[in-house]
């Protein structure tokens, strides 16, 4: 018994200092379910951030005014970045991180500055800050891209950094030498350096690349060289011609004499989407400034094209009036273009398609095609479904083979208006031919060619976000032959034909084109791998039970998520 008391007393003496020290720990860090917690009790901002600066992996610099504030409460340290955002918003602090340190200020210390650039463009400065990971989207640089003056407001560390960077870059350009020949590589990130060629019904459409645009600018818009005139989709560019001394067409505010751009050489390098520049430092800087302003990110647009044939009487019953209004039931209406020469309207495409699908079940409408094209603003999207027949032209001494192409061609060039609406330049060509597969020959042994009809629509339309564009309305006749038979009786040999009869129907069909433009943002991107498990579960449910609604119209991504979560 005495031995047990001695051992207990000895253990108590050893553990007593540890217990006392544990009660005096200042960190107040707790581990609850593997989540770090911090309890602040009227801590100053400086001492508060000092305790977990290691979690942010940045040294923290707190201003004197911000250090006067005090913080109390329990904070989750498992996500330091998220905690920093919430804390600064609640306490009234602003912060900026330049990659080396985190600067924290009181919201009242926010400063503003107007800066004038002399030699570089605003777009070049912004791109430089982004490449150096110094640009903060929370405090954007405001100003006209084509102007030399900009405004910035934010934490003092950010404003001073931007001002010093702008001054340094401006001085570097002004002190650049003009004698020494140098080389530069300018890499494009948002557009193509080489020309792109599209073929539309035998006609080549060339979208000039940045190298071609810059070359034309340096050559004062003169015609391209013979090698470039061959519509090579990826031509090399070598500019060795001198700029005319009496030309003053340059719009560079930093160029006071056109002779500065003499003897500049450019070569497009498509493999890395770069431009190689040969010239002195000032010339390279001017070319870099131009390319930076041209290399801008473009927004993506998804174009859903519906080619629909509707019975004319049913279309009238839907309430379509190309010069008035359209009504679908009692809950929907749309205003149309009142121009007498245009068959165009903007409407709710989903509701119109629902009405078309209902008519399709009655065989009063037919969705001929529904392609979906993803393009960028100011880039043409072409849909061409055509047929071609060939004709031999035989003369007395020579002969040739010619072809005629017809079908449905839709060419759309979308762009965004100042109000966020989608404006489209449209060219629609719809051609039909007779059903003759072989040519007929008359008594003179000359071929009788098939007849081809074409309808062409060319216009510019502006569509609000979420709406669709309905184009068309022209009518053509169709002849349909159908064999109607009595089941079972018509299959009896010999006498079964008695129970069959043919019917012919002549109807007027109206062809319309529905175009649904939609901007694709990064927030609209979905990782399909996340839906794999949900789809698998849905397939299992289909094999074990009957799902009430097998026909589901998915209007948008939210509907897709709801459908998968069913």
UniProtKB/Swiss-Prot annotation:
<dbReference type="Pfam" id="PF21304">
    <property type="entry name" value="T3S_SPI-1_N0"/>
</dbReference>
<dbReference type="GO" id="GO:0030254">
    <property type="term" value="P:protein secretion by the type III secretion system"/>
</dbReference>
<dbReference type="InterPro" id="IPR050810">
    <property type="entry name" value="Bact_Secretion_Sys_Channel"/>
</dbReference>
<dbReference type="InterPro" id="IPR049034">
    <property type="entry name" value="T3S_SPI-1_N0"/>
</dbReference>
<dbReference type="InterPro" id="IPR005644">
    <property type="entry name" value="NolW-like"/>
</dbReference>
<feature type="signal peptide">
    <location>
        <begin position="1"/>
        <end position="22"/>
    </location>
</feature>
<keyword id="KW-0813">Transport</keyword>
<dbReference type="InterPro" id="IPR003522">
    <property type="entry name" value="T3SS_OM_pore_YscC"/>
</dbReference>
<dbReference type="InterPro" id="IPR004845">
    <property type="entry name" value="T2SS_GspD_CS"/>
</dbReference>
<keyword id="KW-0472">Membrane</keyword>
<comment type="function">
    <text>Component of the type III secretion system (T3SS), also called injectisome, which is used to inject bacterial effector proteins into eukaryotic host cells. Forms a ring-shaped multimeric structure with an apparent central pore in the outer membrane.</text>
</comment>
<dbReference type="Pfam" id="PF00263">
    <property type="entry name" value="Secretin"/>
</dbReference>
<keyword id="KW-0811">Translocation</keyword>
<protein>
    <recommendedName>
        <fullName>Type 3 secretion system secretin</fullName>
    </recommendedName>
</protein>
<dbReference type="InterPro" id="IPR038591">
    <property type="entry name" value="NolW-like_sf"/>
</dbReference>
<dbReference type="GO" id="GO:0030257">
    <property type="term" value="C:type III protein secretion system complex"/>
</dbReference>
<keyword id="KW-0653">Protein transport</keyword>
<keyword id="KW-0732">Signal</keyword>
<dbReference type="GO" id="GO:0015627">
    <property type="term" value="C:type II protein secretion system complex"/>
</dbReference>
<keyword id="KW-0998">Cell outer membrane</keyword>
<comment type="subunit">
    <text>The core secretion machinery of the T3SS is composed of approximately 20 different proteins, including cytoplasmic components, a base, an export apparatus and a needle. This subunit is part of the base, which anchors the injectisome in the bacterial cell envelope. Forms a stable homooligomeric complex.</text>
</comment>
<dbReference type="Pfam" id="PF03958">
    <property type="entry name" value="Secretin_N"/>
</dbReference>
<keyword id="KW-0843">Virulence</keyword>
<dbReference type="GO" id="GO:0009279">
    <property type="term" value="C:cell outer membrane"/>
</dbReference>
<keyword id="KW-0614">Plasmid</keyword>
<comment type="similarity">
    <text>Belongs to the bacterial secretin family. T3SS SctC subfamily.</text>
</comment>
<dbReference type="InterPro" id="IPR004846">
    <property type="entry name" value="T2SS/T3SS_dom"/>
</dbReference>
């Amino acid at each position: 018994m005495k031995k047990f008391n001695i051992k207990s007393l000895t253990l108590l003496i050893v553990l007593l200092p540890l217990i006392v020290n544990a009660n005096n720990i200042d960190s107040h860090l707790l581990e609850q379910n593997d989540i770090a917690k911090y309890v602040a009790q009227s801590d100053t901002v400086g001492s508060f951030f000092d305790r977990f600066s290691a979690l942010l992996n940045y040294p923290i610099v707190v201003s004197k005014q911000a250090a006067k504030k005090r913080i109390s409460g329990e904070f989750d340290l498992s996500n330091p970045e998220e905690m920093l955002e919430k804390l600064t918003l609640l306490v009234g602090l602003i912060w900026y991180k330049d990659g080396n340190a985190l600067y924290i200020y009181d919201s009242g210390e926010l400063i503003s500055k107007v800066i004038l650039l002399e030699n570089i463009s605003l777009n070049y400065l912004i791109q430089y800050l982004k490449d150096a990971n110094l640009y903060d989207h929370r405090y954007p640089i405001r100003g006209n891209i084509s102007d030399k003056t900009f405004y910035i407001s934010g934490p003092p560390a950010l404003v001073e950094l931007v001002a010093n960077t702008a001054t340094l870059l401006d001085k570097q350009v002004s002190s650049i030498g003009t004698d020494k020949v140098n080389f530069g590589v300018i890499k494009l990130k948002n557009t193509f350096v080489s020309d792109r060629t599209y073929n539309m019904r035998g006609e080549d459409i060339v979208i000039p690349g940045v190298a071609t645009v810059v070359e034309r600018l340096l050559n004062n818009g003169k015609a391209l060289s013979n090698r470039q005139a061959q519509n090579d989709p990826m031509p090399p560019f070598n500019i060795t011609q001198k700029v005319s001394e009496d030309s003053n067409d340059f719009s560079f505010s930093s160029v006071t004499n056109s002779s500065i751009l003499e003897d500049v050489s450019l070569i497009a390098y498509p493999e890395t989407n770069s431009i190689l520049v040969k010239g002195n430092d000032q010339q390279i800087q001017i070319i870099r400034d131009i390319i930076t302003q041209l290399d801008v990110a473009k927004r993506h647009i998804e174009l859903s094209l519906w080619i629909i044939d509707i019975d004319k009487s049913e279309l009238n019953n839907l309430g379509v009036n190309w010069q008035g209004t359209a009504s679908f039931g009692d809950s929907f209406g749309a205003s149309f273009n009142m121009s007498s020469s245009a068959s165009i309207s903007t409407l709710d495409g989903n509701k119109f398609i629902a009405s078309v699908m209902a008519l399709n079940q009655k065989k009063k409408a037919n969705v001929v095609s529904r392609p979906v094209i993803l393009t960028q603003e100011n880039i043409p999207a072409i849909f061409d479904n055509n047929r071609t027949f060939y004709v031999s032209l035989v003369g007395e001494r020579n002969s040739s083979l010619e072809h005629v192409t017809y079908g449905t061609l839709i060419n759309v060039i979308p762009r965004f208006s100042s109000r966020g609406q989608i404006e489209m330049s449209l060219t629609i060509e719809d051609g039909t031919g007779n059903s003759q597969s072989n040519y007929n020959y008359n008594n003179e042994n000359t071929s009788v060619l098939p007849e081809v009809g074409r309808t062409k629509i060319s216009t510019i339309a502006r569509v609000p976000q979420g709406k669709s564009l309905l184009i068309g309305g022209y009518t053509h006749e169709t002849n349909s032959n159908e064999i109607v038979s009595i089941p079972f009786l018509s299959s009896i040999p010999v006498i079964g034909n008695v129970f069959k009869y043919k019917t012919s129907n002549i109807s007027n069909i109206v062809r319309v084109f529905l175009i649904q433009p939609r901007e694709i943002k990064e927030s609209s991107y979905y990782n399909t791998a996340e839906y794999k498990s949900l789809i698998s579960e849905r397939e299992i449910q289909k094999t074990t039970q009957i799902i009430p609604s097998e026909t589901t119209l998915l209007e948008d991504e939210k509907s897709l998520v709801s459908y998968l979560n069913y």
